[in-house]
Amino acid sequence: MRHRTDVVVIGAGIAGIATAYELIGRGRTVLLLDRDAEENLGGLAKESFGGIWFAGTPLQRRYGIRDSAALGLADWLAFGELGPKDRWPRAWAEAYVERCVREVYDWLRDLDVEFMPMPMWVERGLHVPGNSVPRWHIVWGTGHVLSERLAGHLLGHPARDLLTTRFGHRVDELLTHDGRVTGCRGVVEQTGEEFEVEAESLVVASGGINGDIDRVRANWHTDWGRPPEVILNGSHRFADGRLHDAAGSVGAAITHLDWQWNYAAGVRHWRPRKPGHGLSLVPPKSALWLDWRGERIGPMPLVTGYDTHDLVAQICRQERGYSWQLLNRRIALKELAVSGAEFNPAFRDRKRLRVARDLLLGNRWLYEELTANCEDIVVAGTLPELVERMNELVGDGSVDYAAVHEAASRYDERIGRGPRFHNDEQLRRIEFARRWTGDRLRTCRFQKILDPKAGPLVAIREFVISRKSMGGLQTDLESRVLDLRGRPVP
């Protein structure tokens, strides 16, 4: 099977959709290829919570947040730890913070994408500065609605006749002629039929490598030490680096594959759609983070919302490479969340009253769903029973009751002294987080763990989970893929 088009776009996530939308609007014929099924148009973004980083938006100004491209860039460069040789990562950082409001925020608003009224304040920074102000803008309806809106505008475009879509098509090879990329070749996976595309231009929008756990391990960042025995898969199942290999074979420079944004609080999905399928929890700030023995990780306690990269590093330094979080039902109802569209149905379906109810009264549906189905979560009425069930889960009696009791009772004792005497870094960070309204709504006010009125007790076994690739094909600011000498691949 042969195709001829002006531009072939490989990958129908939001990058591929946006590219195709802009191209047909300029009168170009486009063939949009994707390996997945048509109902999954939108890729991993369709499964995501839908957060996008912006600096200097009208939404921020409405809430009195004084932000700017200059401040955003300063935070980005500090947190990103860019080195002197990172020319293109720095150039892209500068370009994004300068243009993101006009070219992304405003562009999305023009396409009827709405954002929640209050930005979230994540990655505030721990050892180095992070986001100085709240910048995480959440799409109202999660990434599911973001993908649906963009796909709807693409498929309903006045120039729709210029677009051809093909799903179930796996691209294996980029074609060249006289030193120039001229198209691609692959297989229709359902039938085994080969196809070939000839195009004036080719766009790779196929995602990163984090859907292939072997590649994740092979490109593990040195800050994290050795990869843990279990790494759950939280990326797209087809984000496997296949197109990285194809591009590399025609001379593309592939860089910074160790720059991955993975998460520390993954649990196993009980309805897996891929090998090792994991869910990325939003770890409760009021929960105690324990190691595999049940000892509180420290001396610096682990608290989410400040430095995800450091959380992963701390977990990987533990002997067994996984952790526990200790909490109770009251904390779980207010703070426990799963990142993504699947387990935020009220938010995904834009049900305002249910979202408000969950914020005010706690998300009972999610609590029941997780505790009833997730094998990595155990619940008990007393601490001895809880530790017994933790040990039943791991199967070797490695969780020490005395260690868990010591961690919980000492933490509760510090809470009992009152806020003026909170000499515990976790409590200080909870207090700071609650100053921002968006976090105050989702964070308990110094909740004890062993409070009998807040039970039952809950323990969550958490694994590192793969998510986002920050490296890949090196490009200039015109998105032209560069070769090893820094020249555009023709």
Residue ranges and their predicted role:
Residues 46-75:
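N-terminal glycine-rich dinucleotide-binding loop that anchors FAD/FMN and/or NAD(P) in oxidoreductases
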